[in-house]
Curated annotation (Swiss-Prot):
Membership in a protein family: Belongs to the DnaA family. HdA subfamily.
Organism: Haemophilus influenzae (strain ATCC 51907 / DSM 11121 / KW20 / Rd)
GO annotation (BP), single: negative regulation of DNA-templated DNA replication initiation
Stored InterPro entries: Chromosome_initiator_DnaA-like, DnaA_dom, Hda, Hda_lid, P-loop_NTPase
Pfam families: Bac_DnaA (PF00308), Hda_lid (PF22688)
Stated name of the protein: Uncharacterized protein HI_1225.1
Superkingdom assignment: Bacteria
Length: 231
């Protein structure tokens, strides 16, 4: 039996809207901001490939709510093996609910029913903004419960547009700057050409390099990066 963890209440981390590169997704960001201050559309479905920024965006909005003394919860459904559907109870009392990686629980009858019920409770309460992310569009998910399938299309649906290589370099350099070190164009370009191009992989590498450079008191030269990442 899997160990059941308590409700995964979100704590503030370093994901912000300022370090989310939103130039490719301005319509989505504008609509989210408008609804966070004046709730007219409570449901948003955001989909895209791995590393496209879905998790960052959901956590950033959660952070913004919490920093402004508003109630918010982020639920990583990719870790649903560690908690039960009870985590969704009473979430209609929150101002913001973020369900990340919906595809992780699709096909599970208990989870599909629990999310369907949450949709209905949020619609009835009229006080909650619900953000859902997945790796596919609603029509491409193999949802078993027809009523949930229809609920997923109730609100606004957006595909996160992927970043160009040039934009990825800017994102990495901004993240490095916020951590207190510099990432040259040459080194950043080396990273995106030698590693998988999804931002999740690139940020993991950046975190590793940050710790290694601090410990070794070294700048992030290409030879040093090669050594640390075994490239």
């Amino acid at each position: 039996m899997n160990k059941q963890l308590p409700l995964p209440i979100h704590q503030i981390d370093d994901a912000t809207l300022e370090n989310f590169y939103g130039d490719n997704n301005l319509l989505l960001l504008d609509s989210l901001r408008k609804n966070s201050s004046d709730l007219k559309q409570p449901f948003f479905y955001i989909w895209g490939d791995k590393g496209s920024g879905k998790t960052h965006l959901l956590r950033a909005f959660s952070n913004e709510y919490l920093i402004n003394q508003r109630t918010a919860i982020y639920v990583p459904l990719s870790k649903s093996q560690y908690f039960s559907t009870a985590v969704l109870e009473n979430l209609e009392q929150q101002e913001l609910v973020c369900l990340d990686d919906l595809q992780s629980v699709i096909g599970n009858d208990e989870w599909e029913l629990a999310i369907f019920d949450l949709f209905n409770r949020i619609k009835a309460s009229g006080k909650t903004l619900l953000l859902i992310s997945a790796d596919k569009s609603p029509s491409a998910l193999s949802v078993k419960l027809p009523d949930l399938n229809s609920r997923l299309t109730w609100g606004e649906i957006y595909q996160l547009n992927s970043l160009t290589d040039e934009q990825k370099i800017k994102v990495l350099q901004l993240a490095a700057y916020q951590r207190g070190f510099q990432l040259s164009d040459e080194t950043a370009n080396f990273l995106i050409t030698r590693l998988a191009r999804d931002m999740h992989t690139l940020f993991e590498a950046l975190d590793l390099l940050d710790k290694a450079s601090l410990q070794a008191q070294r700048n992030l030269t290409i030879p040093f990066v090669k050594k640390i990442l075994n490239l």
